[in-house]
């Protein structure tokens, strides 16, 4: 079994996350994808609580799973009483899937700081690292050969930050989110001024 792990704040999850999940299933041959909802203290938060972000991520998984069960939302990182590090998440996932091949899916922006992450060597031992680059012109520090690191071009102009900003300005984002998440955001009154 091949298990992919994608961590993020998912504040909110959007069609870019949906596309990445489907890409992982179809082109990386991932059998199971875990979307781990985390809390990044470096990221500005608007108004979505941990439980709301987890609920929206579960809605995203429901959308992804319409074509077959593949994706699970995970709140393990939110439940930790200490700062959560990727290496700890991967240890947890390894305990759930002891014989699986693990792939950590990371965005290009996160990859740039990979060397400063807690235990990057152990991360590479626990999982293949797949970096989703926004395109060759954006990936300025891509090493030609890094053991265990795979670079995949994945151009997606969406970001949760951009969506929160548009919602706060009263703009529609319905074409940029799964409809269930759009309805949830409107029902909960998230990201407004």
Curated annotation (Swiss-Prot):
Entry EC no(s): 2.7.7.18
Record keywords, A-Z: ATP-binding, NAD, Nucleotide-binding, Nucleotidyltransferase, Pyridine nucleotide biosynthesis, Transferase
Pathway where it operates: Cofactor biosynthesis; NAD(+) biosynthesis; deamido-NAD(+) from nicotinate D-ribonucleotide: step 1/1
EC category name: transferase
SUPFAM superfamilies: Nucleotidylyl transferase
GO biological process, one term: NAD biosynthetic process
Catalytic reaction list: nicotinate beta-D-ribonucleotide + ATP + H(+) = deamido-NAD(+) + diphosphate
Gene Ontology MF: a single term: nicotinate-nucleotide adenylyltransferase activity
Keyword Metal-binding: no
CDD domains in the record: NMNAT
Gene3D superfamilies noted in UniProt: HUPs
Family: Belongs to the NadD family.
Known function: Catalyzes the reversible adenylation of nicotinate mononucleotide (NaMN) to nicotinic acid adenine dinucleotide (NaAD).
UniProt-listed PANTHER family: NICOTINATE-NUCLEOTIDE ADENYLYLTRANSFERASE-RELATED, PHOSPHOPANTETHEINE ADENYLYLTRANSFERASE
Entry protein name: Probable nicotinate-nucleotide adenylyltransferase
Organism: Chlorobium phaeovibrioides (strain DSM 265 / 1930)
């Amino acid at each position: 079994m091949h298990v992919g792990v994608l961590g993020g704040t998912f504040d909110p999850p959007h069609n870019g996350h949906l596309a990445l999940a489907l890409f992982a299933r179809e082109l990386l041959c991932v059998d199971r994808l875990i979307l781990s909802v985390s809390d990044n203290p470096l990221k500005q938060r608007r108004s979505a609580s941990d439980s709301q972000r987890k609920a929206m991520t579960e809605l995203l998984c429901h959308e992804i799973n319409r074509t077959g069960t593949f994706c699970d939302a995970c709140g393990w990182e939110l439940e930790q009483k200490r700062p959560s590090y990727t290496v700890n998440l991967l240890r947890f996932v390894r305990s759930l899937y002891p014989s699986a091949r693990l792939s950590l899916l990371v965005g290009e922006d996160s990859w740039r700081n990979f060397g400063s992450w807690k235990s990057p060597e152990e991360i590479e031992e626990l999982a293949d690292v797949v970096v989703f680059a926004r395109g060759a012109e954006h990936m300025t520090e891509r090493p030609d050969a890094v053991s265990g690191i795979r670079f995949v071009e994945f151009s997606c102009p969406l970001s949760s930050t951009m969506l929160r900003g548009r919602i706060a300005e009263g703009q529609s984002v319905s074409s940029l989110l799964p409809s269930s998440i759009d309805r949830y955001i409107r029902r909960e009154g998230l990201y407004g001024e």
